[in-house]
């Protein structure tokens, strides 16, 4: 069935979301064997066991990941897959070609200067074009409309589970400038996103009655707990979990190193744009510089929902994004941290192609572009070629020879961070396995072409 652009979704390389890639016989029986074996082994096992189901080699080039959720979906053909035939304001956008990559230098001049660090994946496609559905899909790496999605953790929570250091002061997963669409799911709450809003810094790190009074009350609390706490056999692991939470909270309090992370210098704030997004990017830089335990940062920025008056609104949004990300890339590169950090920026889908709609805007559309940087990827290029309007992929230019889907992006993040994306976690509490990547290898996989 063709849409109003004359495009038949069923012809896309890779099936539409209601007919996702199917399991072959061999993979089906491999998973069946894992499931039966896991079920038989469950009695007497720890609450969560890890099953690696395929021999894969993660890239492991990154220590950190900064994920930009460009909420409500920017127009891909006016930003990272620029299409002159669609009629953007050329004098303002100043389209310029860098090593064969067409880029709107006038719209995003700072990113144009950093293009040698960027890879623009233009062969990406969303499964649907509904905001809430796809924002969640992108952040959990699977269909939110399935029963398992209700307990599915955010990608950042999986990273937290895998990479949290017991000596860390700060949470492994921090969310800036907006609330993620998912939390820790069935994973321990310690892996949930630690939400920070605005540029006011970390709240409640000093007691209102002073440090000495706080220390005295803490000591009194310890004595009270020691006198009346039930035994470990009665409470299981709960006392240890509570003690761990208290310890981590106390490490954040009266900590000058932590305070410095959230003290944003006025001149530097201006260089980042002096906006909430700029403050979030500056905070992300400070978190990475501190090396105090944070491994995954989500920065939310939107709304890009430009159904009307596209070009004035896009110019303002892209300008803020350019100032903040452009400066972040420059600072991380100067610090030697860019090679240790995978940066991913994407919306939940793209925007309609060709002429603007009757309100001078663009509506929801599944084709999109994703920006990658850092982690020693080979920058200054694009992966994937779309048709002259940007409506569909004509050359995927990666090993799967189809569109890049959200699950593939999830696998790419895991691979860069050294995480086996084929992992299955089996939790006795709900008696089933949870795949980091749905149906894993043989269906979805990392875009390793980013590394050349």
Question: PLM features: what roles do these ranges have?
Answer:
Residues 1-452:
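Ligand-binding pockets and gating/stacking loops
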